[in-house]
Curated annotation (Swiss-Prot):
Keyword Ribonucleoprotein assigned: yes
InterPro entries: Ribosomal_uS7 (IPR000235), Ribosomal_uS7_bac/org-type (IPR005717), Ribosomal_uS7_CS (IPR020606), Ribosomal_uS7_dom (IPR023798), Ribosomal_uS7_dom_sf (IPR036823)
Organism per entry: Onion yellows phytoplasma (strain OY-M)
GO terms assigned for molecular function: rRNA binding; structural constituent of ribosome; tRNA binding
Name of protein: Small ribosomal subunit protein uS7
Family: Belongs to the universal ribosomal protein uS7 family.
Length: 156
């Protein structure tokens, strides 16, 4: 651990199209090998497809999707007395957001549609409607936390 105190959070610049820091964050997660232009193209094209699918404001659909998949509880492994316990704990708001964004990109890459834009648009629309793989992932995380409620007193 660092002895020089806490590290300051680096602030990201809002993206030029939607003026949103959240959009910049997901673009940075999509980005591979420093190709930010390509990541931006993928995300903006996906939002255009979301607009054609839902006939609604794409950034609002994206926010809805993110709110539907952000976990409130998670389990963390704690070693006590030679045993590992899955201890449920609340998720901080920043971590909630970053987990949601990472899950979107991870499951988009695993899906088997034709292009990344189509896959991303499909995942966003599904999550905004409250179904799909991402919502199941969140429910599974909550179920694990609920099942291990007995170990909640081991929290740190």
């Amino acid at each position: 651990m660092s002895r020089k105190g806490h590290i300051k959070k680096r602030d990201v610049q809002p993206d030029p199209v939607y003026n949103s820091k959240l959009v910049t964050k997901i673009i940075n997660i999509i980005m591979e090998d420093g190709k930010k232009g390509k990541a931006q193209t993928i995300f903006y094209q996906a939002l255009k497809q979301v607009k054609t699918i839902t006939n609604r404001e794409p950034i609002k659909v994206f926010h809805e999707a993110l709110n539907n998949i952000m976990p409130v509880l998670e389990v963390r492994t704690r070693r006590m007395g030679g045993q590992n316990y899955q201890v449920p704990s609340e998720v901080r708001p920043e971590r909630r957001q970053s987990l949601g964004l990472r899950w979107i990109v991870k499951y988009t890459k695993e899906s088997n549609e034709k292009t990344m834009e189509e896959r991303l648009a499909k995942e966003i629309v599904d999550a905004s409607l409250g179904n799909g793989v991402l919502v199941k992932k969140r429910e599974e995380t909550h179920r694990m936390a609920e099942a291990n409620k007995a170990f909640a007193h081991y929290r740190w």
